[in-house]
Amino acid sequence: MESNSNSNETMYGNPNINMGFVDSGNSNIGNNTGSMSPPPQQQQQPQQASSTPAGSVGIGGLSFSLGANGISLEPSSISHRVNAITSKIKEFKQERMETTRDWRSFVGSRQQYGLPNIKDTTSRIKENVVYFQSNYLILFLCFSVFFIITNPFYLLLLGVLLFISVYLHNSTTLTDIQRKIAYGIQAFLSIYFLLYAGSSIFWLVGATCCITLLHASFHSPNSTDETNIKFGDGV
């Protein structure tokens, strides 16, 4: 009995034995934690994140790349495209203005209006349409601007369609599937625009055609001889 009590006292009373037990446990825990490796999913996440190119944004399966191969949003690129668009508008305006007749001649006086003969109606309409074609086009554009201003939703749809067209034309990073999706969205918005704004478009085209036919029918035709036509007179 005395030997057993002495052995117990030496085991529980000796601090070196307890320290050795604790140290061995801590060393085992440290070795286990050091040898542990993260799950495979956690290791693959940085690789997936790094596979996305920098400077690109994905929306609905379409990647809007801002790099050199996509649409660049740098000030120099934007200014270049704006200058190209404005130059085309100026060229179109210059060409139309050169063929635009004097608006006083277009409106005319009472003496320039009269009922045409039935056999001369077709020739009169043809001559006036050829002579005043730029004036009729300007009237159509004025009606179109009024139509768009009074319907902001149509302006939004046209802006989205224009953005998709420009992006598809300039982007070189889209895959075939992404291009098909973009073309599908463009076709859907175009059909929706025609269905939603069908009555307004019919009114726009109908009003322009009625004014053109009435004016060309009752206005006395001017000479369409190239030697007597002076483009841009009075503009």
UniProtKB/Swiss-Prot annotation:
It is a multi-pass membrane protein. Its main location: membrane. The chain crosses the membrane at residues 144-164, 187-207. GO terms for cellular component: Golgi apparatus; membrane. The gene is prafA. It is found in: Membrane. Belongs to the PRA1 family. May act as a general Rab protein regulator. It holds the Pfam family PRA1. It comes from the Eukaryota. Residues 1-55 are annotated as: Disordered. Keywords: Membrane, Transmembrane, Transmembrane helix. Residues 24-48 have a biased composition (Low complexity). Residues 1-17 have a biased composition (Polar residues). The keyword Magnesium does not apply. InterPro entries: Prenylated_rab_accept_PRA1. It comes from Dictyostelium discoideum (Social amoeba). This is PRA1 family protein 1.
